[in-house]
Amino acid sequence: MTRPLALIIFLVAILTNTDPSRSDAGSDPVNYLFRGPVTAVAAIAGEGEHAGIKGSLTFLQKSLDGRTVINGTISGLPEGKHGLHIVDSGDMTKGCYITTAKGHLNPFNLSHGAPSDSARHVGDLGNIYADDTGISVINLTDTVISLFPTPAFVIGRILVIHTTYDDLGRGGSPVSKVNGNAGGRLACGIISYV
């Protein structure tokens, strides 16, 4: 038997498993293949004049319909609040610049908002705060983003830290409803499975 044929048979067996004695068996291949928990990481780095910014964020989602917990530390940031967003791109060939990274991840075509808003971009994660030493300790829980293959899937997307704070779509201008007036990009990293 050739390797490709063996692989196809193996995948078909997994996707069609309906053994009633197994609690994880069933007709949903996403739940079967991704039983969770699922973990991911984004290695954050600045460029050019922001090259001193670095850190790492970990993502944990325990089940397909579960919340995603984001933890980590970023150093080298200017003191203050900074918008934190996931953009609809994974292409960093030109770095973190606006010409490379597209707009916020928004598969449902909604306006920009706060993480707690019922209608918002998938990629709207609000603000982080850097203290007077340039360190931001991040502990967030989000109910929208997903590490599982759904429309809110963030694996392979770019996580961006902005120059200024995100007004959460409440700035009263058209730009506020697009990007929260969060300014340019300080640092970024691609979200990848661990």
Curated annotation (Swiss-Prot):
Cofactor binding annotation: Binds 1 copper ion per subunit.
GO BP annotation list: removal of superoxide radicals
Binding locations of Zn(2+): H104, H112, H121, D124
Protein name: Superoxide dismutase [Cu-Zn]
Organism annotation: Ramazzottius varieornatus (Water bear)
Subunit note: Homodimer.
Classification via InterPro entries: SOD-like_Cu/Zn_dom_sf (IPR036423), SOD_Cu/Zn_/chaperone (IPR024134), SOD_Cu/Zn_BS (IPR018152), SOD_Cu_Zn_dom (IPR001424)
EC number assigned by the record: 1.15.1.1
Cofactor(s) the protein requires to work: Cu cation; Zn(2+)
Signal peptide: 1-20
